[in-house]
């Protein structure tokens, strides 16, 4: 994923709303504990005082610390690089939540009803952005957040296959000199940001 922070609009929640709808994430009015697979954050450049807003989600690290600390292997990285949680083997210890430097994981505290059958979830499990695998595995080429951002007219999010040098996201990443968040951690994330 590539995110152009200059195109991300303060106050817009199109990407968050689309993710919530796609994955059946309904809040209980408790922002501190409600599941957030993607959230909008504000950052400030201390040298210029520029304040920007941007979406923050699982960074799909090449070297994911969440997988390293998981005692059951429930946190895992697929061959295509997508980092996921196996709801059947997650024991809810939340070590992965503590290990994630991006606070990109949520814990399901409540019993869930009326779930989206494409994205089953379970009480007592950890969860995070899975790059809409329910769509991608069935041939879709975009995520819900990208579609929503495009529909809103911002075009801040570009999704695709970073291993395909001719893909739209690869072209954007190679031409914009983007950076990774907390590059000092050497996690080799697959989410890139420009203009931050």
Regions found by a protein language model. Give the residues of each.
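Non-ligating segments of multi-cofactor redox enzymes
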Residues: 1-196
């Amino acid at each position: 994923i590539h995110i152009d922070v200059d195109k991300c609009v303060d106050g817009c929640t199109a990407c968050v709303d689309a993710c919530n709808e796609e994955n059946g994430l309904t809040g209980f009015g408790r922002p501190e504990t409600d599941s957030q697979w993607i959230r909008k954050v504000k950052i400030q450049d201390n040298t210029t005082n520029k304040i920007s807003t941007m979406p923050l989600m699982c960074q799909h690290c090449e070297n994911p610390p969440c997988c390293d600390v998981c005692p059951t292997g429930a946190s895992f990285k697929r061959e295509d690089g997508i980092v996921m949680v196996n709801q059947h083997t997650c024991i809810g210890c939340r070590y992965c939540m503590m290990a994630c430097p991006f606070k990109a994981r949520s814990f399901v505290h409540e019993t869930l009803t009326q779930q989206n059958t494409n994205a089953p979830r379970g009480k007592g499990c950890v969860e995070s952005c899975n790059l809409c695998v329910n769509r991608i595995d069935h041939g879709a080429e975009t995520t819900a957040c990208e579609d929503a951002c495009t529909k809103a007219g911002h075009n801040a999010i570009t999704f695709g296959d970073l291993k395909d040098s001719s893909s739209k996201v690869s072209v954007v990443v190679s031409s914009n000199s983007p950076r990774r968040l907390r590059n000092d951690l050497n996690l080799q994330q697959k989410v890139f940001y420009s203009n931050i």
